[in-house]
Curated annotation (Swiss-Prot):
CC cofactor: Mg(2+)
GO BP terms in the entry: isoprenoid biosynthetic process
Record text on cofactor binding: Binds 3 Mg(2+) ions per subunit.
Function according to Swiss-Prot or TrEMBL: Terpene synthase that catalyzes the conversion of (2E,6E)-farnesyl diphosphate (FPP) into sesquiterpenes which are important for fungi-environment interactions. Produces a mixture consisting of 8 sesquiterpenes including corvol ethers A and B, as well as traces of epizonarene, gamma-cadinene, delta-cadinene, alpha-cadinene, alpha-cadinol, and an unidentified sesquiterpene. Produces both corvol ether A and corvol ether B in similar concentrations.
Family membership noted in the UniProt record: Belongs to the terpene synthase family.
InterPro entries associated with the record: Isoprenoid_synthase_dom_sf, Terpene_cyclase-like_2
Marked site: Plays a critical role for substrate recognition: 92
Free-text comment about domains: The Asp-Asp-Xaa-Xaa-Xaa-Asp (DDXXXD) motif is important for the catalytic activity, presumably through binding to Mg(2+).
Sites marked Plays a critical role in the stabilization of intermediate cation: 88
Protein name stated in the entry: Sesquiterpene synthase MGU_11447
Amino acid sequence: MEKQRLKAQLSSLRVPLFSVPWPGQCSNKAEVIEARMMKWADEHNLLVTDEYRNRVIRTRYGLLAARCYPNAGEVLLQAIADYLVWFFLADDLFVDRVEVATDETIRNLTAMVDVLDLNVAGSPPVFGELAWLDVCQRLRRLLQAETFERFAQGMRLWATTAALQILNHLRPTSVGIREYQTIRRHTSGMNPCASLADAANKGSVQACEFYDADVQTLVRQTNNIVCWANDIQSLRIEIHQPGQFRNIVTIYAQQGQSLQDAVETTATRVNKEIAGFCELADAVTARPISDELHGLIDGLKYWIRGYLDWVVHDTMRYADQFIESDADDRRFSAPDLSLLKKKLLVCD
């Protein structure tokens, strides 16, 4: 009933564009990174069917990496691009575009945490686990130990707060805005992405600067800007998902607003967050800070602008014409590992 009421308002929905007062950038290795990412995803059996491969091709996750980390060295940028394609596919197949909870949900998510904690894959591995292990081992080699642990902690929280998101979708109505924001802050994957922003620019920030209250506020504002803008931009397809569909817009609608008013309320909050980020970033960079912290703040700006540009110029992930085919991944969920093993034998 909740979904049907929301779907009825989609045809007239107007989605706003967002702007920020700094230019976008993109690595000149973007197309090479994208091609290698597709090859890597294929080699790690993430592209479960030709239909799924075509979807990933038109989504352009390598371009997202190139826009958000334009100054990263080629080896690090490739690892980040491979991480992003893995993350989006795992998030879709484990949480978002399948049933709210399945027999495999706990096993899938705990396997991802175990890779971080134990640095090995289970036997037998779940879908995507070997790809995830490969990404983590590459990042361990490329990053300082502290930086990798920031990334790893963000990913542990992604896997564990996914359970809170599932619990919210098992309720007849959603939790409120405050509780949702807490869940969204960690299930989005933005914290691990932000933790790579310094290494991809001028090097790793020391803990005393990274955990400074103002710096953490900038990280949180970056998270909020990307997440809440995404809640608007992905609204049409998320409402058609079989499992997870509640977000900040639908919660405002649940509280009595029309869907259009809920979008505008959310957009106002995004723009306010952008203004707050700009003001605080200017204040922090006016202080005597390290080059690495300057690089981190630049990296947060790259992420905000890079994500917004990716949505407008590159990706078809949220395109209306693919909603019917892309919103429901139940036919792809829990791919048969024996079939993947046979595929590997054929390739060998």
